[in-house]
UniProtKB/Swiss-Prot annotation:
It comes from Mus musculus. Residues 780-789 have a biased composition (Pro residues). Transcription factor, which represses ZNF609 transcription. Residues 277-303 form a coiled coil. This is Zinc finger protein 608. The modification Phosphothreonine is found at T480. Keywords: Coiled coil, Isopeptide bond, Metal-binding, Phosphoprotein, Repressor, Transcription, Transcription regulation, Ubl conjugation, Zinc, Zinc-finger. There is a cross-link at K282, K879, K1117, K1175, K1181, K1198, K1215, K1233, K1249, K1291, K1309, K1413 (Glycyl lysine isopeptide (Lys-Gly) (interchain with G-Cter in SUMO2)). PANTHER family: BRAKELESS PROTEIN, ZINC FINGER PROTEIN 608. The gene is Znf608.
Amino acid sequence: MSVNVSTAGKGVDPNTVDTYDSGDDWEIGVGNLIIDLDADLEKDRQKFEMNNSTNTTTNTTKDCGGPASNGTCSTSALADGLKFASVQPSAPQGNSHKETSKSKVKRAKTSKDANKSLPSAALYGIPEISSTGKRQEVQGRPGEATGMNSALGQSVSGGGSSNPNSNGTSTGTSAATAGAGSCGKSKEEKPGKSHSSRGAKRDKDAARSRKEKHDLLQGHQNGGGGQAPSGGHLYGFGTKSNGSGASPFHCGGAGSGSVGAAGEVSKTAPDSTLMGNSMLVKKEEEEEESHRRIKKLKTEKVDPLFTVPAPPPPIASSLAPQIPPSYFPPSSSNIAAPVEQLLVRTRSVGVNTCEVGVVTEPECLGPCEPGTSVNLEGIVWHETEEGVLVVNVTWRNKTYVGTLLDCTKHDWAPPRFCESPTSDLEMRGGRGRGKRARSAAAAPGSEVSFTESRGLQSKNRGGANGKGRRGSLNASGRRTPPNCAAEDIKASPSSTNKRKNKPPMELDLNSSSEDSKPGKRVRTNSRSTPTTPQGKPETTFLDQGCSSPVLIDCPHPNCNKKYKHINGLRYHQAHAHLDPENKLEFEPDSEDKISDCEEALSNVALECNESSTSVSSYDQTKAPGSPGAGNPPGTPKGKREHVSNGPGPIIGSKTGKNSGKKRGLNNELNNLPVISNMTAALDICSATDSNLTAEMPKLEAEGLIDKKSLGDKEKGKKANNCKMDKNLSKLKSARPIAPAPAPTPPQLIAIPTAAFTSTTTGTIPGLPSLTTTVVQATPKSPPLKPIQPKPTIMGEPITVNPALVSLKDRKKKEKRKLKDKEGKETGGPKMDAKLGKLEEAKAASKDLSGHFLKDHLGKSEGLANGLSESQESRMASIKAEADKVYTFTDNAPSPSIGSASRMECSTLVNGQAPMAPLHVLTQNGAESAAAKTSSPAYSDISDAADDGGSDSRSEGMRSKASSPSDTFSNKDGVVKGHPSTSAQPSQLKESHSPYYHGYEPYYSPSYMHPGQVGAPAAGNGGSTQGMKIKKESEEDAEKKDKAEQLESKKVDHTSAPLQPQHQSVITQRHPALAQSLYYGQYAYGLYMDQKSLMATSPAYRQQYEKYYEDQRLAEQKMAQSGRGDCERKAELPLKELGKEDNKQKNMPSATISKAPSTPEPNKNHSKLGPSVPNKTEETGKSQLLSSHQQQLQADSFKAKQMENHQLIKEAVEMKSVMDSMKQTGVDPTSRFKQDPESRTWHHYVYQPKYLDQQKPEELDREKKLKEDSPRKTPNKESGVSSLPVSLTNIKEEPKEGKRPDSQSVEENKLKNDDRKTPVNWKDSRGTRVAVSSPMSQHQSYIQYLHAYPYPQMYDPSHPAYRAVSPVLMHSYPGAYLSPGFHYPVYGKMSGREEAEKVNTSPSINTKTASEAKALDLLQHHANQYRSKSPAPVEKASTEREREAERERDRHSPFSQRHLHTHHHTHVGMGYPLIPGQYDPFQGLTSAALVASQQVAAQASASGMFPAQRRE
């Protein structure tokens, strides 16, 4: 096809150009183009060079007569369209082209007018669909996606240009396309030639088929556009029919491209049958407006196959600028010699490439639209066996470092089959975002573009897989629907609109680093046929993209969204409609289409799972999720995992078709995110379960099957997942907000256990425990059902970023959980079962809690929290990934990523060092831990996993169920949910860090392995307990029995894997630590930041000190009341206080013994083995857990008590060591990389932990020792408050008296902590709390928390806390507090839950309410738990609850905490931890803890002191 960019175009009307409306093609291009940063830039430059040098807009009127389908010399139209190459009078076009060449995005955005936009759009759109074009499309799409936002013109550019850009047709066409492509296009065009060769091969096949299909189009198109490659004219080069035909040529290819020709596009559009929708171009000429056109085009958007090969008309980048609209109309003949030349050059490939580069140009692009397919080029920094891929990629001229999670192993990405995050977002947008709100131009093409951009990211993830996947990338799924898109798009003009939703999924599959320029286009191989940009290969892609070529229409009455994958639809429904009707649609469709489409996805998931390649869950392009699983088995897991924006679709890849079929359903049911992770894990466990999980989301929307299927099918497999799902279901019910995530949340929810269990099994090499866990999770499955409501929360726009964070958190948690599970293989499953029960019991409570969380999260806090640092920037994207939040939950089960990744940071986790890169990849930049913290989204994952992937799984899932809450609460709460997992990895990762120094041996070995065993169990337990506690009031007895059984079992299991010392610690810790671990972990994870805050913020310090005093008082009261039990609830304030004091006195005795150990824990951490420090922590934690878990674990309590006794002994040892250390002046904490005060805080952490741990045994023992209680109460307070220094009995005895001494220490600590977490606490707490009033409340609270470890611990974002990681925080008094808070959190779930739920929601948002409530609940729950250890728990629980309630109410609003979570790095888990951990995360206890831990992990990751990051 000679690249005759016929001058005919000259005669073409500007309208024609307008009609050409690049929007369509651009969109298509976006679909096909995966933004290749380097490629784009290169192409841009190349194209500019080409255009400038060979500005010859070829007359290329040859094709004018070509397939006369266009009637008039398509060449004319093409020429016109190509005229842009020759900078002639096409003023509008010229501007557009110029802009296009310069910044197509801008042009599209400015949408110059249909005419202007259209000309360039036409040029872009015209870009040949040749194979290269397809590639270009893939590449250009990401940029185009953005461009798409701008305007149709841009869309065309993106669509048509996209392909051509990639294709570059390696000939004049490439150049011409470059010209047409303009800047953005040229970007891609530069590599376009290369693409032409590579892409051409691939695109050629597809494009050629299409070309053959649309050869007549091509004839005209060729005539019209010198880039007459077969593919090229596809764009509607045969737009000649349209009259001017200039636009139509584009139309042919882009479907909308023709639209560029305005009315003519319509004519051409039919010609551009290939483009399918391109035909749909409905005479956009009338709609000359670029945006309108884009919308229309978008709707009509050429089929995903997209034949993006916008004819080569876009001859040269310079041409684009050169060609003015007038030029366009004026010259039908030689648009410009340069164009001709370029076209001629390009023509041979038949891949007419129009560069969409402009759209892709970073300068011209705003934030990428969700669902934009992106081709990322970069370097793999690290890949772990857990499916974490750390990459340094260039996109839009910006370099990104990220962690990609293997979708297969980590399922916390948007549903793989969600056709487009954009669509779902739009649907969700109904909630808060305009449908197209996400699209800058509000053009469907734009959105598609964004979706595909996401897919492009996914491409990176696809890795080598990219080639096969390539086809799936379409502007709107152009690529994605090679089968689907063409037919679907063709079938329904509006399908383009929908298509934008679907393609991202498919794109995601493609988007892998391998996808980059050469491989990216080729990636379609996985997809099989869909290699052609035109999407001719409909079968292959059909399978992946959708069960049938036809897009699945949203059954909702008022919704015309179409999805290639049922998952996309499900996601959309869950988020947008959340109606039972969706459920029907989803279910049948799901079963049907997901069977087909997700079959590949499942396969991919399986493949990914096997190869650890795809992080399906991680695929955050919930919308694009369709292709997500498609990564070939060999695809690096990290690759897939990376694209949080667009990877979701990856799951839907065709690679695993046969295996994926079974899995496809699973995935389908799992709704992609769970699918991959769950599929991976569940693949091991059971495809059916996965299916159910996948179904869960839709069921979630339905609220029917989810529970049933989840409960039944995923019972063993996804106890946690189910749990989450139940919560989701409940949340969903409670909060209809669930926009699109409805389908996903169940996945996410399903994933937690599945991930915890199955994912863990699949994710980490040490998966054995995972499998066991999975089985064990079976009991939880029914309880998981209540979590279903989660989607509702997910629906919250705010949740979007948090969703991403959640996903990452989940992933991390999952990893962590995996590790934890490994270590706690035996214990984990029991925990899981226990969790299941707890979840079941507290599903409702959790739901409420989740609801509150959702509400709070709904507040900007959820967003702030969830959107950590970079998450905020990705908010739109994350919004699109609300689904991903669910996916995060889904991913949460990927402890591999969470655990491994998190632990990776410290490379402490059993051979998890690789995970550190994951952390880095996971956007936790600083160290490995820092790396995981660096990126909010990744940080969440890291932190979540680090903080307690396990709990986060459950809790995080539940949190995810309450999306917003999970957003920060998942950030906070995911971490909270995964305290064990998180703590363990955190510890591991922080094992090098001083916080984990002692903990490393303990937590890393003990906690890590046993801890992992126990952490997942504990994490699960924590999550479970969080849910448990929530439900505890509901099913306190049942839970107690079961939980205790589980706890004892867990203790046994945990103990068995653990070393004796570790065993005792973990056993103790597993029951007490299981929850306390989460909590303490969080506390520890947070505590470091507190110091930073204190140090950094005098105000905070003041407030904190005051608060600390109050808290100590409250804590004392609470500890007493909490220790006291539920029975004393009435008299808790007085009696329990006394009892608590006595108990605390006794306990402080041990605590004091351990108190010296508090510094010692650092030392002993290393020395005694983390066991002793752990014991100290565990003592505090034990107290917490005691109150919290005593209910939960009667048997466990006994076992734990034994271990507590051991721990007490060890604590005494530690106390000696600590004392010597203290006396020696060696700050045990110095062992931890933290300032002395921070270490002091660490001591606090440890001492409370020990106190907590000792609490169960000391409850008995110290009840005996009541004599010692006067002295010990102060001690305990001291231990709790200022364990490190003020462990002396004096401190606790007079709360205030102790305050002076202890407060000196504690104030120092607090100051340190404040310095440490000034931003965190100051922001979260200072802002949140009246310094004096909350302090008074928090005083008892703090006392309960041992000097308010959480406030200190509360600053997980603080490096100290981060370094401490959830593990430290877990054991440390924060642990106690955590259980305290946890208890309130759980307590909230329990008796108080309902009443406190409202408070909790504020709590989540406001520390004040949160703390008061959490404390109340804490007390309540503590009472429940402390029924086992009556005295301390009761008082602590009740009193603390009360005080916490007041305290929290006035202390700080959750918004502040949320804010901190939002600044994940800054606040990390720290911000809401104290209140949030207690009350705010009553429903989200684990989530809060997880979030806190995330912050803590982040703190360590972001440097020892998050304060730096915090600020």
